[in-house]
C-alpha cells in the first residue's frame, strides 16, 4: 500500500520511539500560535517586514537574539547553518583566495571552498585511540599553519564537534587576530552552551568574529532554523549581508522565523529554570551510565586536556563499544528494535545520543535502563578480525592533495571501480553522514588506506555518502 510523507510522519509521531536525536524540541514543544502552521504561513505582506531588508518586526526579532547571545549583530538563517557557513566563508575570503579550516568541518564548508574557488589548508584533529573520537584543534597548529601560509584570509574551526569536543577558542582567536584575519566558528551543535555553567563557554564569549549556531539541533526550534552572530570589526557587514541574500531563499518561511522567535522568547523568560532542571536530569542519567561494566560512557575527564580538547559538551552522551562483543551499529539496532530509542549517530565503535533541554526524566530513564540491561548481557571478549579491520583509522595528510577542489570538480572525469582507484585523483567527496566529515575531497589522491576504510564501513552496514554511486562500489576520478 502506498504511503505518503505526511501520513507516515503522523503515524510515526503516535508511536513509542523516543528521540535521542535532533531536532532539540524532541517533538514536545509547540507554542499555541504554532499549532496550525498553515494559519501563519505567509509571504512578505504589509506589516511583516522582509528578511533580506529587515526594518520592522524581523529586525526587532534579530536584535533580541543579539541581546540574548551578547553579539554585536545576529541574523536569522532559514536555510540552516549551511547558509551561515556558505555566507561567512564567502564574506571573509576573496575569489580564489585561501582559507585555513579544520578537516572535520561540515560538508557545507567544502561547498563554499568550491564555490569561491579557494585554496584550502587543513588542520587535523588527533584521534583518541580508546574511543576513535576526533579531538580538538590546538592553538599551536593554528599558529604554525598561519606562519607557513601567510596568504590565508580566514580561519574556520568546528567547536563543539559533532561529538561535543571543544577547542581552545580563546587562544585560537588571539592567534588569528594577531594576523589581522577573522575567526569563524561553526558552533552548530552549541546554541545551548551559554545557558548553563554545566556546559563549555560559547565561542562568542571567547573572541570569535562569526559564530554560526543551529537552533534546531539543541534547542526547541524547527528543523532548518539557525543563527549567525557577529562581533568586532574584521568582517564586512555589507559583504556578509550580500552573501546571506545569495545563499538564503528569497521566500523565507514565516513558520520557521516564528519558531525561532518562540524559542528565543522561551529562553529570555525561562532559560534559567529550564536549564537548571535539564542539567539535573542529564547528570543523573550520566551517573547511572557511569556504572556500565562493558559498554562505556565517555566522560569529560577522559578527553579534556588531551588531543587538543579544551572542554567537552556533556549533553552529548557517547557510549563506546570498544572491547566488547557488540559494535556501534548493533548497539543502535538493539536500542531501537527492543527499547524504541532512536540514536543521533552510530559509528563502528560508539553510538551518540543527543540530549536537549526538552528531554524528559522518563526519556533519560529509558536510555539509562536500556543500556544497563544491554550491558549486563555482554561479555568483554575482543572482537573478531572484521571488527578490528573496521576500526582501522585513516591519518589525513596534506601530501594527498594534488589540486584544488574547484579545479578538480570542474575537470573531466571517468568512473572506475573503487577497488581499482588507488593512485587516482578523486573528483568526489566521500563521507559518513552523520556527521558529514569527508575522508576524501576532490583533488586528493585515492589511497589504499582509504579504499580499505570505505570497504570496512560498508561491511559494518554504515552508509557512505557523497559518491554518485550510492553503493560506493565506484568512484569518479580525474580523467587521464
What are these regions (language model features)?
Residues 463-480:
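Charge-dense polyanion-binding interfaces
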Residues 284-466:
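Conserved C-terminal alpha-helix-loop-beta "cap" of PLP-dependent enzymes
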Residues 5-10, 32, 81-301:
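Conserved PLP-enzyme active-site core in the AAT-like
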Residues 27, 162, 217-218, 233-235, ...:
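Short, glycine-/Ser/Thr-/acidic-enriched flexible segments
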Residues 1-56:
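N-terminal "arm"/small-domain region of PLP-dependent enzymes with the aminotransferase-like
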Residues 38-80:
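Conserved N-terminal alpha-helix of the aminotransferase class I/II PLP-enzyme fold
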Residues 76, 122-124, 213, 345, ...:
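Structural signal for conserved beta-strand scaffold positions within catalytic alpha/beta enzyme cores
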Amino acid at each position: 500500500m502506498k504511503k505518503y510523507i505526511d501520513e507516515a510522519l503522523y503515524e510515526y509521531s503516535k508511536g513509542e520511539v523516543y528521540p535521542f536525536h535532533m531536532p532539540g524540541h524532541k517533538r514536545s514543544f509547540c507554542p499555541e500560535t504554532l499549532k496550525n502552521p498553515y494559519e501563519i504561513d505567509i509571504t512578505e505582506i504589509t506589516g511583516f517586514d522582509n528578511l533580506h531588508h529587515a526594518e520592522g518586526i524581523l529586525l526587532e526579532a534579530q536584535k533580541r537574539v543579539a541581546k540574548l547571545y551578547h553579539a554585536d549583530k545576529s541574523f536569522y538563517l532559514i536555510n540552516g547553518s549551511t547558509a551561515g557557513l556558505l555566507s561567512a566563508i564567502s564574506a571573509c575570503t576573496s575569489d580564489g583566495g585561501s582559507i585555513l579550516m579544520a578537516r572535520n568541518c561540515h560538508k557545507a564548508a567544502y561547498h563554499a571552498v568550491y564555490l569561491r574557488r579557494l585554496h584550502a589548508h587543513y588542520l587535523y584533529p588527533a584521534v583518541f585511540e580508546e574511543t576513535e573520537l576526533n579531538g580538538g584543534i590546538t592553538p599551536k597548529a593554528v599558529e604554525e599553519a598561519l606562519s607557513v601560509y601567510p596568504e590565508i584570509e580566514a580561519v574556520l574551526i568546528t567547536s563543539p564537534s559533532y561529538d561535543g569536543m571543544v577547542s581552545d577558542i580563546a587562544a585560537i582567536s588571539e592567534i588569528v587576530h594577531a594576523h589581522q584575519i577573522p575567526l569563524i566558528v561553526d558552533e552548530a551543535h552549541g546554541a545551548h552552551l551559554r545557558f548553563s555553567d554545566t556546559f563549555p563557554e560559547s565561542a562568542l564569549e571567547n573572541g570569535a568574529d562569526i559564530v554560526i549556531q543551529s537552533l534546531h539541533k539543541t534547542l526547541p526550534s524547527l528543523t532548518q532554523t539557525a543563527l549567525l552572530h557577529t562581533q568586532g570589526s574584521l568582517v564586512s557587514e555589507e559583504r556578509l549581508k550580500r552573501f546571506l541574500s545569495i545563499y538564503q531563499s528569497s521566500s523565507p518561511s514565516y513558520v520557521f522565523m516564528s519558531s525561532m522567535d518562540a524559542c528565543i522568547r522561551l529562553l529570555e523568560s525561562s532559560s534559567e529554570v529550564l536549564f537548571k532542571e535539564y542539567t539535573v536530569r542529564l547528570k543523573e542519567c550520566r551517573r547511572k551510565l557511569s556504572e556500565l561494566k562493558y559498554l562505556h560512557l565517555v566522560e569529560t575527564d577522559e578527553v579534556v586536556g588531551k588531543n587538543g580538547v579544551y572542554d567537552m559538551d556533556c549533553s552529548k552522551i557517547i557510549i563506546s563499544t570498544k572491547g566488547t562483543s557488540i559494535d556501534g551499529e548493533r548497539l543502535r539496532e538493539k536500542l531501537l528494535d527492543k527499547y524504541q530509542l532512536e540514536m543521533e549517530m552510530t559509528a563502528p565503535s560508539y553510538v551518540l545520543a543527543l540530549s536537549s533541554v526538552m528531554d524528559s526524566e522518563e526519556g533519560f530513564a529509558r536510555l539509562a535502563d536500556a543500556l544497563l540491561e544491554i550491558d549486563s548481557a555482554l561479555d568483554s571478549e575482543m572482537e573478531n578480525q572484521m571488527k578490528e579491520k573496521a576500526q582501522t583509522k585513516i591519518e589525513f595528510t596534506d601530501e594527498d592533495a594534488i589540486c584544488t577542489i574547484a579545479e578538480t570538480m570542474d575537470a573531466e572525469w571517468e568512473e572506475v571501480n573503487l577497488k581499482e582507484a588507488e593512485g587516482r585523483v578523486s573528483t568526489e567527496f566521500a563521507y559518513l553522514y552523520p556527521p558529514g566529515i569527508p575522508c576524501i575531497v576532490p583533488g586528493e589522491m585515492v589511497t589504499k588506506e582509504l579504499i580499505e576504510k570505505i570497504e570496512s564501513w560498508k561491511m559494518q552496514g554504515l552508509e557512505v555518502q557523497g559518491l554518485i554511486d550510492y553503493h560506493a562500489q565506484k568512484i569518479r576520478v580525474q580523467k587521464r
